[in-house]
């Protein structure tokens, strides 16, 4: 049915009700999933535009369809802006996701069966860094490094594994690691065995853009990221590089299209362009600085309440709460906090005795609450409420008290109003 007059709530009330309920949940629940954020109304306006109708296989100026003169402008804006954000001289903004951006890098630079060296999912890495259940661990021989007893990346172990296995690619980046990474050390390790250094900065891209976390651009052969998370754009992916050879750039271009994707999502690329412009604003740096301040305030409060944070604290936007030895599991903690309107995700911790479906950890992140306007004291209050729930996860009176406090806090900091 095509109509300019009928509204969604009239035509499809079931779907409209679900969308409205989710909008309400985002307003009255506090979002602490480290990979989630709230994109701006401007980003959503671009993503909901007529550009969703346009097919545009190819790249700006080299399309396989007519009528691309305006979407070419949108994509070129996104390319130029993300280059400026990260100081890159190559950028591809077409990947539909971070996982597809990673897949593109692997397929552009490796052959099936080649060895890759990446961070273990169980120690804070990502599925796409060589996990056996992921295509990256099926197409390639994946060797995994981890963290030491202090919860820090063991660079000596990474070097030892690289020397032993001679990977074609070293993968650096994470989904649950709260300290800074020594990109120069990783590059030295990769160079010592003649490997590519590939950095997945999906979680920290916004922090890198604002200069509050070390940039991998001077060290990596190629870098990928999502465009949501700390970058606060639409869901999608990018590939960027600095100093990449013309041959490497051609490989990356051709593997994204026509290698693994067909038509790009032009409405999403337009939304990316808006987000990249926002990332160039002075306010974006202030925001990212506050993200880290809020994370550190939360981590310090949880430590003071007797909870262990993997690596002893955080230097970015996230922290991993280690509950090994406690009666409450990550799964149960996630459910209890959800009842109190605090949204988190269970997460495995290093040497976790529980299964990945249960876990002994929680991953917490501050990008979304900082977008709402939370400051350090708000984060301290929130961390204390989290500890209250974790101390008594089955006490309905505690859950109700925390839920009321969280609801009141959320009302002080509306997302979209």
From Swiss-Prot:
It is found in: Cytoplasm. The record marks 228 as: Plays an important role in substrate specificity. GO terms for molecular function: glycine hydroxymethyltransferase activity; pyridoxal phosphate binding. One of its GO terms (biological process) is glycine biosynthetic process from serine. (6S)-5,6,7,8-tetrahydrofolate binds at residues 121, 125-127, 355-357. Pathway: One-carbon metabolism; tetrahydrofolate interconversion; Amino-acid biosynthesis; glycine biosynthesis; glycine from L-serine: step 1/1. Pfam families: SHMT. It comes from the Bacteria. Homodimer. This is Serine hydroxymethyltransferase. It comes from Xanthomonas euvesicatoria pv. vesicatoria (strain 85-10). The lineage of its organism: Bacteria, Pseudomonadati, Pseudomonadota, Gammaproteobacteria, Lysobacterales.
């Amino acid at each position: 049915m095509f109509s300019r007059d009928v509204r969604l709530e009239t035509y499809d009330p079931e779907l409209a009700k679900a969308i409205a309920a989710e909008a309400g949940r985002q307003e009255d629940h506090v979002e602490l999933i480290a990979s989630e954020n709230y994109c701006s109304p401007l980003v959503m306006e671009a993503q909901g535009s007529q550009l969703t109708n346009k097919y545009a296989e190819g790249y700006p100026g080299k399309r396989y369809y007519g009528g691309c003169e305006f979407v070419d402008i949108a994509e070129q804006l996104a390319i130029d802006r993300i280059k400026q954000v990260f100081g890159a001289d190559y950028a591809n903004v077409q990947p539909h996701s971070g996982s597809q951006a990673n897949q593109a890098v692997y397929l552009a630079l490796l052959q099936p069966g080649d060895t890759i060296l990446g961070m273990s999912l169980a120690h804070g890495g990502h599925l796409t860094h060589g996990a056996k259940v992921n295509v990256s661990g099926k197409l390639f021989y994946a060797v995994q490094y981890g963290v030491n007893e202090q919860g820090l990346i063991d660079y000596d172990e990474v070097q030892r594994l690289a020397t032993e296995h001679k990977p074609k690619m070293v993968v650096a980046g994470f989904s649950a690691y709260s300290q800074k990474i020594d990109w120069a050390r990783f590059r030295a390790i990769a160079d010592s065995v003649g490997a590519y250094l590939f950095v997945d900065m999906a979680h920290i891209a916004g922090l890198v853009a604002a200069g509050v976390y070390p940039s991998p651009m001077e060290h990596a052969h190629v870098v990928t990221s999502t465009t949501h998370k700390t970058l606060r754009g639409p869901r999608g992916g990018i590939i960027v590089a600095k100093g990449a050879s013309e041959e490497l750039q051609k490989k990356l271009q051709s593997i994204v299209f026509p290698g693994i994707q067909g038509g790009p999502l032009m409405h999403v690329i337009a939304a990316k362009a808006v987000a990249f412009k926002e990332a160039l604003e002075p306010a974006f740096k202030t925001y990212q600085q506050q993200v880290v301040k809020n994370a550190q305030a939360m981590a310090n409060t949880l430590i003071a309440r007797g909870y262990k944070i993997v690596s002893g604290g955080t230097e970015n936007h996230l922290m991993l709460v280690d509950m090994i030895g406690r009666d409450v599991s990550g799964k149960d903690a996630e459910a209890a906090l959800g009842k109190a309107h605090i949204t988190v995700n269970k997460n495995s911790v290093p040497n976790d005795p529980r299964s990945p479906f249960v876990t002994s950890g929680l991953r917490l992140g501050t990008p979304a609450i900082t977008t709402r306007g939370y400051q350090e004291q708000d984060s301290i209050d929130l961390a204390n409420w989290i500890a209250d729930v974790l101390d008594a996860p089955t006490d309905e009176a505690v859950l109700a008290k925390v839920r009321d406090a969280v609801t009141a806090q959320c009302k002080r900091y509306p997302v979209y109003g």
